[in-house]
């Protein structure tokens, strides 16, 4: 191992000098011994005169010029394998849950190449989530990438938590959750919820939260992904990878780019935005050994879907769940917009003719209702034709039937969560479209599971 010395410290950026014959490679981890442990840096660039520019994963308070720096000769490596299940880690692979040492003998570097083209495997198998609006309009592909897009406070994290709960309990494989630049409170809540629901023993969690240095938030997704890759490649498992929030990964890259003095690109983003996003997303792949199905929450700043940080994610997704503020304001939860959400596998050859037709007919009715809203606002319902009145009535029932009580929000709403099978979802919407429930009041369809629950709710309402 080569030794160098600190020659400059500016915030979390540390310049280190080595001898000419022992320069560390890019992305190597460097260690600085401290009284209370060690400080870990990552080499970002060679700046000439035998100097390297590094980013620190820990606060640089008290670091002095001349301090000794040790080159570990390899990128940052984290523990992998079954010993990581049920545990919580930071970006360095250190346990955060005060439950003793990690029983894992293997480690893997967080910087790795994506699988080769000859190793990839594409799948068109539907992964049932138990959430009606998703299963009907934007079905998930096993081994695909799914994005939940929305502004602040529209329910991205709740939706991700519900997906974890539903799929982890139904799904036999392992899950990895990466908290990227999100709230520590949400991470704590999620940990306890997973412990209570019994899915924690099959889950590995990594956190790099809002208050951490940009280098941590930039690399935490790679730490989680590396753990998921081990389960896919070595254990030959189908893995679920949850990333909340992928936009914070982009934002951390922007901060790091500014710290390193790179010229900014559009809207202040880093010039390497597409490269960084591609390097992460291309590793989230399904191979002949196993699959990684990823669910990514995507924060949309100021609800602007043209923001370069959001657009950089679009091209990598197989399905897109758009969360709409106007639906959240009407308390239509989950606030998924069925007209803006889509999936690569909503195709009659994959999901079947019946599913495809029901989904498209639901969208057709909702689109017609949207087109008529201006007319209704100005002239009122009375001016509509009988056919349009019927369309509006069914659209309003469909809107309410798309809502669903969540397991993870039971404690707030007082309504028990519902898991609805895909078969029941298709049957319910088909019956509404056929007019079998035109006589039922609209409110009977709100926050229920199956269509039978809506009929039972209507009986309760009529009895009052």
Curated annotation (Swiss-Prot):
Membrane topology listed for this record = Peripheral membrane protein
Q: Which residues bind ATP?
A: 150-157
Q: Where in the cell is it found?
A: Cell membrane
Per its UniProt entry, which superkingdom is the organism in?
Answer: Bacteria
Main subcellular location of this protein, as a coarse class: membrane
EC number of this enzyme: 7.1.2.2
InterPro entries assigned to the protein according to its UniProt record, in alphabetical order: AAA+_ATPase, ATP-synt_VA_C, ATP_synth_F1_bsu, ATPase_a/bsu_AS, ATPase_alpha/beta_chains, ATPase_F1/V1/A1_a/bsu_N, ATPase_F1/V1/A1_a/bsu_N_sf, ATPase_F1/V1/A1_a/bsu_nucl-bd
Name the GO cellular-component terms. Answer: plasma membrane; proton-transporting ATP synthase complex
**Enzyme category, top tier:** translocase
Key words of the record: ATP synthesis, ATP-binding, Cell membrane, CF(1), Hydrogen ion transport, Ion transport, Membrane, Nucleotide-binding, Translocase, Transport
Reactions accelerated catalytically: ATP + H2O + 4 H(+)(in) = ADP + phosphate + 5 H(+)(out)
One annotated GO molecular function: ATP binding
Pfam families reported in the protein's UniProt record: ATP-synt_ab (PF00006), ATP-synt_ab_N (PF02874), ATP-synt_VA_C (PF22919)
Per the record, the similarity remark reads:
Belongs to the ATPase alpha/beta chains family.
Chain's role: Produces ATP from ADP in the presence of a proton gradient across the membrane. The catalytic sites are hosted primarily by the beta subunits.
Question: How does this protein assemble?
Answer: F-type ATPases have 2 components, CF(1) - the catalytic core - and CF(0) - the membrane proton channel. CF(1) has five subunits: alpha(3), beta(3), gamma(1), delta(1), epsilon(1). CF(0) has three main subunits: a(1), b(2) and c(9-12). The alpha and beta chains form an alternating ring which encloses part of the gamma chain. CF(1) is attached to CF(0) by a central stalk formed by the gamma and epsilon chains, while a peripheral stalk is formed by the delta and b chains.
Q: What protein name applies here?
A: ATP synthase subunit beta
Classification lineage: Bacteria, Bacillati, Chloroflexota, Dehalococcoidia, Dehalococcoidales
């Amino acid at each position: 191992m080569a030794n160098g010395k600190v020659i400059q410290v500016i915030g979390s950026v540390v310049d280190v000098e080595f001898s000419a014959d022992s320069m560390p490679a890019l992305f190597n981890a460097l260690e600085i011994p401290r009284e209370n442990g060690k400080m870990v840096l990552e080499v970002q660039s060679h700046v000439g005169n035998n100097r390297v520019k590094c980013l620190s994963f820990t606060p640089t308070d008290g670091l002095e010029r001349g301090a000794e720096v040790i080159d570990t000769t390899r990128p940052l490596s984290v523990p992998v394998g079954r010993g990581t299940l049920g545990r919580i880690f930071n970006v360095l692979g250190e346990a955060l849950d005060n439950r003793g040492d990690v029983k894992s003998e293997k480690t893997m570097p967080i910087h790795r190449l994506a699988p080769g083209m000859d190793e990839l495997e594409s799948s068109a198998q539907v992964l049932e989530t138990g959430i009606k609006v998703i299963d009907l309009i934007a079905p998930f592909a096993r081994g695909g990438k799914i994005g939940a897009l929305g502004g602040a406070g529209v329910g991205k994290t709740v939706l991700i938590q519900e997906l974890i709960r539903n799929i982890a309990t139904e799904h036999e494989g392992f899950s990895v959750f990466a908290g990227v630049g999100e709230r520590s409170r949400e991470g704590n809540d999620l940990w306890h919820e997973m412990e209570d629901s019994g899915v924690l023993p099959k889950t590995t969690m990594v956190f790099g939260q809002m208050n951490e240095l940009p280098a941590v938030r930039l690399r935490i997704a790679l730490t989680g992904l590396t753990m998921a890759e081990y389960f896919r490649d070595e254990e030959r498992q189908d893995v679920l990878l949850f990333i909340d929030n992928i936009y914070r990964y982009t934002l951390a890259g922007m901060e790091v780019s500014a710290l390193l003095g790179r010229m900014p690109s559009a809207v202040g983003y880093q010039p390497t935005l597409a490269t960084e996003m591609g390097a992460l997303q291309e590793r989230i792949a399904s191979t002949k050994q196993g699959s990684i199905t990823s669910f990514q929450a995507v924060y949309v700043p100021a609800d602007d879907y043209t923001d370069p940080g959001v657009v950089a994610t679009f091209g990598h997704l197989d399905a897109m769940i758009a969360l709409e503020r106007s639906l959240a304001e009407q308390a239509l939860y989950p606030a998924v917009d069925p007209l803006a959400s889509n999936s690569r596998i909503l195709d009659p050859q994959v999901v079947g003719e019946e599913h495809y037709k029901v989904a498209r007919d639901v969208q057709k009715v909702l689109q017609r209702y949207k087109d008529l809203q201006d007319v209704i606002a100005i002239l009122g319902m009375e001016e509509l034709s009988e056919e349009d009145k019927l369309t509006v009535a069914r659209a309003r029932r469909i809107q309410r039937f798309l809502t669903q009580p969540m397991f993870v929000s039971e404690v707030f709403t007082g309504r028990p969560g519902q898991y609805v099978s895909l078969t029941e979802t298709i049957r319910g919407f088909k019956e509404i479209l056929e007019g079998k429930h035109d006589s039922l009041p609209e409110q009977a369809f709100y926050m229920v599971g199956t269509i039978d629950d809506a009929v039972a709710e209507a009986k309760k309402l009529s009895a009052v």
